[in-house]
């Protein structure tokens, strides 16, 4: 049971809460009424706004649509006016551009091309929209005139600014490849930069709009002429320079002229010039410039000319490669890609044909020289052939994409030169063997025969062209001729590819064949001499000359490839001839040789028969000595070392024999006039022998 006080308190608390809740409820009711009122007010406002908006829309939309229609009409009018202006402009193109077209593109190419573009568009418009319009014919004619003017401008620019490359610049360009030190690259500027831009611009327009390829023919004709003239100018430069100074150019000349190359001259082949120098060197070494030398030195005038022509041709070949490379770079900028190869092929034909024709002329001249047995002239083929082979990779690269007939020209020339070179080598060997001249040009003093000097000289030239000469022989499959087995490794790659070792062996065998033929011929020629001693001197001189020449020119190393004992064999031949010569003195020394002398008892008076025998011995010795000295004085042993050796050996023998004879019989009273028989002292005999082989004594 809750106490009354607590229940009363609880009731008051509940009443307070109820009162509080009633107040809250009253507040909520008031708030709801206010909210409803606000909602009604808002709905009323929105309804009013919507009504007004609808009224506004109903009044604005018609105005907007009307404005839009007006704007569309305005745009259509503007477009129509623009189209009319555009169409009308085509009718004015002819009059607007006629003056520019008439005056031509010179000096204002871009403006001219702009006018041509307008004319082109006018032509297209009238063709599409009014093909019967007289305006079409007018703009067509104007376009054709404009195109012709552009073609004329192209020709004019190419003609005016295409210059022949000077020989000096060409020589610098060629020598640049051989320079070891770093130098500025030699650049060929065929056309000035501004002109090149115009030419390129015109060519592109003609290809794109002109639909005309005639300008390509104009291009290759003009450039072909300049290329050909540049090469001919270089050749003429060599001829003029050689006629004025003896050589095409010389860096040793202190005062450089304007036609002097700025770089070092490249190494000249100088085949004939080198031949002359070698011949002089060996003739001086072997002949002391006295006997037998005069008929061995070739005519320098003709050989100088051959030398210049050879050098000129080699330089022209190199110049062609450099110019062709430069021409192709220029052509790539001007000519459309799909026409470049064909145009380039046409461009180089004249210059290439000229080089090939000159090469064939060289082959023809060599063929005639072989018939005349003028083998020194044939030597010009060797440096040219070597250079052509060295240049062939560049040639092939330059001629990529050209016609097969163009590509085959150089290989054809190389084959012709190899064939004629191989024939020259074979004919030379046969000529050495079968040389018919015996008495006609035999040296009366027994000195070196011209055939020997010429043969050695020819072989010496092959040292500089070992690979070329070996390839000549190998290309003609001459291995069987020299009985050299072919190594499968040397022939497996291709029929014309031979190793350098095989070529060296082949050339060595060829040289040995020539030397063998020469030796046989010399033996035959030596029989012309009636005196065996002079025959021996002749063979000695020739064998010694051959050996010394082989040693000095390093031919001996090449010979030793297939003939290891060649040097020893020649020394034995030389010694044999010395011994043969020494036997000629037996008819002198036999008179006073101890084995042929009678024995006299000392102190016993000589009988008349004995005195007469001693007189005959002295007289026979004196007469024989005088006769031999007189005869052999005019003989020649050009090699100083050999001459002194032979003199000394003979002097020792004769002095010893004569000294012993004189010692035995000089004091014997075999005559009342001893000075009549004892004409010479031992020293005098030695002096007489010292004067052998010396025409100046």
UniProtKB/Swiss-Prot annotation:
<protein>
    <recommendedName>
        <fullName>Exocyst complex component 7</fullName>
    </recommendedName>
</protein>
<dbReference type="GO" id="GO:0006904">
    <property type="term" value="P:vesicle docking involved in exocytosis"/>
</dbReference>
<dbReference type="GO" id="GO:0005886">
    <property type="term" value="C:plasma membrane"/>
</dbReference>
<keyword id="KW-0597">Phosphoprotein</keyword>
<dbReference type="GO" id="GO:0030674">
    <property type="term" value="F:protein-macromolecule adaptor activity"/>
</dbReference>
<dbReference type="GO" id="GO:0000145">
    <property type="term" value="C:exocyst"/>
</dbReference>
<dbReference type="InterPro" id="IPR046364">
    <property type="entry name" value="Exo70_C"/>
</dbReference>
<feature type="coiled-coil region">
    <location>
        <begin position="5"/>
        <end position="42"/>
    </location>
</feature>
<keyword id="KW-0813">Transport</keyword>
<feature type="region of interest" description="Disordered">
    <location>
        <begin position="238"/>
        <end position="270"/>
    </location>
</feature>
<dbReference type="GO" id="GO:0034451">
    <property type="term" value="C:centriolar satellite"/>
</dbReference>
<dbReference type="Pfam" id="PF20669">
    <property type="entry name" value="Exo70_N"/>
</dbReference>
<comment type="similarity">
    <text>Belongs to the EXO70 family.</text>
</comment>
<keyword id="KW-1003">Cell membrane</keyword>
<keyword id="KW-0472">Membrane</keyword>
<dbReference type="GO" id="GO:0000281">
    <property type="term" value="P:mitotic cytokinesis"/>
</dbReference>
<comment type="function">
    <text>Component of the exocyst complex involved in the docking of exocytic vesicles with fusion sites on the plasma membrane. In adipocytes, plays a crucial role in targeting SLC2A4 vesicle to the plasma membrane in response to insulin, perhaps directing the vesicle to the precise site of fusion. It is required for neuron survival and plays an essential role in cortical development.</text>
</comment>
<keyword id="KW-0268">Exocytosis</keyword>
<dbReference type="GO" id="GO:0005546">
    <property type="term" value="F:phosphatidylinositol-4,5-bisphosphate binding"/>
</dbReference>
<keyword id="KW-0175">Coiled coil</keyword>
<keyword id="KW-0963">Cytoplasm</keyword>
<dbReference type="GO" id="GO:0032584">
    <property type="term" value="C:growth cone membrane"/>
</dbReference>
<dbReference type="GO" id="GO:0090148">
    <property type="term" value="P:membrane fission"/>
</dbReference>
<dbReference type="GO" id="GO:0071806">
    <property type="term" value="P:protein transmembrane transport"/>
</dbReference>
<feature type="modified residue" description="Phosphoserine">
    <location>
        <position position="133"/>
    </location>
</feature>
<feature type="region of interest" description="SEC8 and ARHQ binding">
    <location>
        <begin position="1"/>
        <end position="384"/>
    </location>
</feature>
<dbReference type="GO" id="GO:0005829">
    <property type="term" value="C:cytosol"/>
</dbReference>
<feature type="coiled-coil region">
    <location>
        <begin position="63"/>
        <end position="85"/>
    </location>
</feature>
<dbReference type="GO" id="GO:1903438">
    <property type="term" value="P:positive regulation of mitotic cytokinetic process"/>
</dbReference>
<dbReference type="InterPro" id="IPR004140">
    <property type="entry name" value="Exo70"/>
</dbReference>
<dbReference type="GO" id="GO:0090543">
    <property type="term" value="C:Flemming body"/>
</dbReference>
<dbReference type="Pfam" id="PF03081">
    <property type="entry name" value="Exo70_C"/>
</dbReference>
<dbReference type="GO" id="GO:2000535">
    <property type="term" value="P:regulation of entry of bacterium into host cell"/>
</dbReference>
<dbReference type="InterPro" id="IPR016159">
    <property type="entry name" value="Cullin_repeat-like_dom_sf"/>
</dbReference>
<dbReference type="GO" id="GO:0090522">
    <property type="term" value="P:vesicle tethering involved in exocytosis"/>
</dbReference>
<keyword id="KW-0653">Protein transport</keyword>
<comment type="subunit">
    <text>The exocyst complex is composed of EXOC1, EXOC2, EXOC3, EXOC4, EXOC5, EXOC6, EXOC7 and EXOC8. Interacts with RAB11FIP3. Interacts with ARHQ in a GTP-dependent manner.</text>
</comment>
